[in-house]
Amino acid sequence: CISARYPCSNSKDCCSGSCGIFWTCYLRKDPCSKECLAP
């Protein structure tokens, strides 16, 4: 995880990928607008 914020669609869905373990995933109204934010 290099960027502090990015759409999951650009990185294999951070919610289920390795980023999700350390980062927090936020679900927007649009399921395709998930975002992982650094803790």
From Swiss-Prot:
Expressed by the venom gland. One of its GO terms (cellular component) is extracellular region. Signal peptide: none annotated. The keyword Secreted applies. It comes from the Eukaryota. The presence of a 'disulfide through disulfide knot' structurally defines this protein as a knottin. This is U1-nemetoxin-Csp1c. The lineage of its organism: Eukaryota, Metazoa, Ecdysozoa, Arthropoda, Chelicerata.
